[in-house]
Amino acid sequence: MKTSLFKSLYFQVLTAIAIGILLGHYYPELGAQMKPLGDAFVKLIKMIIAPVIFCTVVTGIAGMESMKAVGRTGAVALLYFEIVSTIALIIGLIIVNVVQPGAGMNVDPATLDAQAVAVYAAQAKEQGIIAFLMDVIPGSVIGAFASGNILQVLLFAVLFGFALHRLGSKGQLIFNVIESFSQVIFGIINMIMRLAPIGAFGAMAFTIGKYGVGSLVQLGQLIICFYITCILFVVVVLGTIARVTGFSIFKFIRYIREELLIVLGTSSSESALPRMLDKMEKLGCRKSVVGLVIPTGYSFNLDGTSIYLTMAAVFIAQATNSHMDIFHQITLLVVLLLSSKGAAGVTGSGFIVLAATISAVGHLPVAGLALILGIDRFMSEARALTNLVGNGVATVVVAKWVKELDHQKLDDVLNNRAPDGKTHEISF
């Protein structure tokens, strides 16, 4: 039993995170130097994301009997994303107004270091709904795979899957090759995941070593408020959605616990994307649904990021005494409904979208971003964890709505009555 525990990825990642925190706290300079370990692991994951999405989506779509089902799945997914992410934005807005974590700080924007956020502000200028939509179309197929742009790869994979389906029996050989290639790719993922403890250790040691636990104290009220809001969102909102769909949110969280720990260590929900594709399919969701919902959700269904954006924007207003009446807050909400869709599931993207939103609203001082620049990295974990759980729940919900969910398999796996519910831990 003890040997099995030590070999489990869950235990190894958890231990690595704890060691990383201790190293970063007691030896901050050494901890800060561990950054390449975390970066290398995330890069290895990103290396494999494009082929995983391509194989999953192509085989899922080409293997379907009707192409109408694909369109229906996409429409249902986008509707769900819009509804739930809007709820997340509103919840963040309500709680930050009730708790008011920035009230009483009386910060003069003129005293803030605007240079510290200049890079993010410059990147934010490139954000926009037209630019975002145009960026979905790749300049070339090779370019889409080379850059690892999830939506570009997804677009090409959907078109390829449709074309392959239309070939019928003539395309069977290509289908078999891609399916075999998919098995090889998931084999590579299993090898990469063996390095997850090292990546989690490096990323956590760097975070604590560079920013220090002390940086949490000054703006701790915002951090605590944000974490509690994310927990409430997962338990109450996603929990209710899960219950209506027919499963327990707590059992689901237990099922993806390894992926959650990897995300906690790397602070990027993207690092768990390949494994989520595999685990959601083994949970009873059809491959075509998983292939469409999970990758799309990484741009359109970032619940944690949505909560963060409203709370951070209003916090800056409160801290700098920039009065926001109901009209300003509604304007903020409308802008965020658009700008939040441009955030990807990678570290730092939420802060860039926040900069874009504040610039677009115009009522808030952009220099106010400097207030949360130092603690943004600590809030990134809660964003990423909430995003991951949200996309997992979305996949099950959409699969049920389009009648592509194996309810018996879902129940068996979550209740450990099937082998799939026990064999996903990687040990070595």
Swiss-Prot record:
Keywords: Cell inner membrane, Cell membrane, Membrane, Symport, Transmembrane, Transmembrane helix, Transport. GO terms for biological process: L-aspartate transmembrane transport. It is found in: Cell inner membrane. The chain crosses the membrane at residues 4-24, 44-64, 76-96, 142-162, 184-204, 222-242, 289-309, 326-346, 352-372. It is a multi-pass membrane protein. It comes from the Bacteria. SUPFAM superfamilies: Proton glutamate symport protein. One of its GO terms (molecular function) is fumarate transmembrane transporter activity. InterPro entries: C4_dicarb_transport, Na-dicarboxylate_symporter, Na-dicarboxylate_symporter_CS, Na:dicarbo_symporter_sf. It holds the Pfam family SDF. Its main location: membrane. One of its GO terms (cellular component) is plasma membrane. Disulfide bonds: none annotated. Belongs to the dicarboxylate/amino acid:cation symporter (DAACS) (TC 2.A.23) family. Responsible for the transport of dicarboxylates such as succinate, fumarate, and malate from the periplasm across the membrane. NCBIfam families: PRK01663.1, PRK13027.1. This is C4-dicarboxylate transport protein. It comes from Salmonella gallinarum (strain 287/91 / NCTC 13346).
